[in-house]
């Protein structure tokens, strides 16, 4: 197998946005989990919540993809100059030779859970406001 060059990395997690807060948390042996109140849960839950994700505005042409998961992806593009590094690599090598590898998240699931709560009582149809293919679908973030 031919080795691949990795020329830019970043991370956006409950530890913070970018590599610096991630490294700091690892060195300090600090978790990103915090006790949270969540929806209608009656007991406290320790969650890894990405700060600032709810305030992110996606580009106008990608509004159909608006969900927490894709807002976190947008934060990743903005962190550590990652989007600029991808553009530079595409310019240098051609877009067909550049790959972006993504981790997974369940952060978009709440939007789908809320949609299921509002299904049509007679038909069972989900609300038109749920853009499943652009938000909860497994491939949503890579399409975004």
Language-model features: locations:
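Conserved "HGTGT" condensation-loop signature of ketosynthase/thiolase-family condensing enzymes
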Residues: 1-144
